[in-house]
Regions:
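N-terminal glycine-/charge-rich "phosphate-binding" loop or analogous flexible N-terminal tail
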Residues: 1-43
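Rossmann-like dinucleotide/phosphate-binding beta-alpha-beta segment
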Residues: 127-186
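Phosphate/diphosphate ligand-binding glycine-rich loop within oxidoreductases
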Residues: 43-118
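Phosphate-coordination loops involved in phosphoryl transfer and adenosine-cofactor binding
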Residues: 1, 82, 132-135
Length: 186
């Protein structure tokens, strides 16, 4: 029996319990998924970064911590975390991130804030450069970075990507490793 602790607020538990139960059952796993469990019996933790869990020390048997969100910046430096940290990436998360990145890239590219907030009654004729003349760099080319880079490249932006490890992505000029970080920013 695999003991999985859901470490998050009640609202998140209500939202995630059924989908997690279904996904684990579909994979034929024998598991116990609970919002509380004695720390010494926990095999895995499903971690809500906004939840109350801050000290991972008592979870000595824990084999991995899976974050519910793509961002891990609030837990990656937690000195009590000794188990491997994974993050959840699914189709909807990826799609949402692509929409957000493309939306804000276009917002800045087209100068939408000037149009929305510059309502002083004075007409200003501004010619926006084509996407092909506006390079974009994405730092981090994991599942989310890659999807965003591909979407921006499909819109005609020249996209540069940087990753810690070597990757090949069609339509994206890639740099990898610390040595090439500054080149990606040029």
């Amino acid at each position: 029996m695999i003991n999985i602790l859901f470490a998050g607020h009640q609202q998140r538990w209500d939202e995630y319990q059924a989908p997690l139960d279904e996904a684990l059952t579909d994979r034929g796993l024998e598991f116990s998924l609970l919002p509380s469990c004695p720390p010494e019996e926990v095999d895995y933790i499903v971690y809500d970064p906004s939840g109350p869990l801050e000290d991972f020390t008592p979870y000595s048997r824990c084999q991995a911590v899976m974050g519910l969100w793509a961002g891990v910046e609030n837990v990656v430096d937690n000195s009590t975390l000794s188990a491997p940290l994974t993050r959840m990436v699914d189709q909807n998360l990826t799609r949402g991130m692509v929409e957000w990145v493309v939306g804000h890239s276009l917002r800045h590219h087209l100068g939408m804030d000037r149009h929305l907030f510059g309502q002083d009654g004075i007409w200003r004729s501004e010619i926006t450069p084509l996407a092909a003349d506006r390079p974009i760099t994405i730092l981090g080319m994991g599942a989310l970075g890659r999807a965003c880079a591909e979407a921006l490249a499909d819109l005609g932006f020249p996209v540069t990507g940087w990753s810690r490890t070597r990757k090949r992505i069609t339509g994206v000029e890639m740099y990898c490793g610390e040595r090439w970080f500054n080149n990606a920013l040029k």
